[in-house]
Amino acid sequence: MFTSLYNKLHRQLEYMQTFHASMGHVEILVNSDKRFLEGGPSIGKKREELVKRAEGKYLCFLDDDEDIADNYLETLVRLCHRDADVVTFRSFAKLKGYWCLIDMGLHYPNDQANPNYTVRRSPWHVCPVRSYFAKLYSFSDINYGEDWLYFEQVLKHCTTEAKTESIIHSYQHGDHSEADKIVQSEQGTRSNSKVLR
């Protein structure tokens, strides 16, 4: 799934450079270290390394269990030109076998996911945020929940947002992401250790 996402980003970047070069520079950084289950660093360490490498005015993350709309990059760049602290948008999320619409906003509560109505949530690490604020904090050296622990701190500095009502992103919770495989592995290890006792 990552290769498909990476290719989409590069196609959108080529389009931007060809038709909207005046909108500025976009940097796509990838951490290709081994996965944690193969002896590589934690997801938190990988994210931290990317934050340190980032040189742009804004930064955000995309993971291997996410997808983007064809206008994702252009939409975000246009919103970043509004010079707000964070950029927010709408996203589809597949959780526990159902899809729901997530509407992210700076002053929104974190509603529980529900397939029957639009779920309002605070901005997540997938939302572009001022790099200055992002670099004030570090990701924890963990594999699950590192994104919210980090972004919750960063959001304390955000007072303005640039928002689109467009759905430009999707997240599909499942067994294929690195974090999900790590959690499954840890649960399996705990189950096996109980059986062996």
Model-derived features with residue positions:
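Acidic donor-binding loop at a coil-to-helix junction in glycosyltransferase catalytic cores
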Residues: 144-150
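Glycine-rich, basic loop-to-helix element that forms the pyrophosphate-binding segment
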Residues: 37-54
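Acidic donor-binding/catalytic loop of UDP-sugar-dependent glycosyltransferases
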Residues: 66-79
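A recurrent flexible, glycine/aromatic-enriched loop bordering the glycosyltransferase active site
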Residues: 94, 109-129
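Short beta-strand-to-loop element that shapes/binds the nucleotide-sugar donor at the catalytic cleft/hinge
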Residues: 87-101
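Short, well-formed alpha-helical segments that are part of the catalytic scaffolds
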Residues: 1-20
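Short aromatic/hydrophobic "clamp" motif used to bind/position activated sugar donors
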Residues: 59
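Active-site donor/metal-binding and catalytic loop motifs
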Residues: 164-196
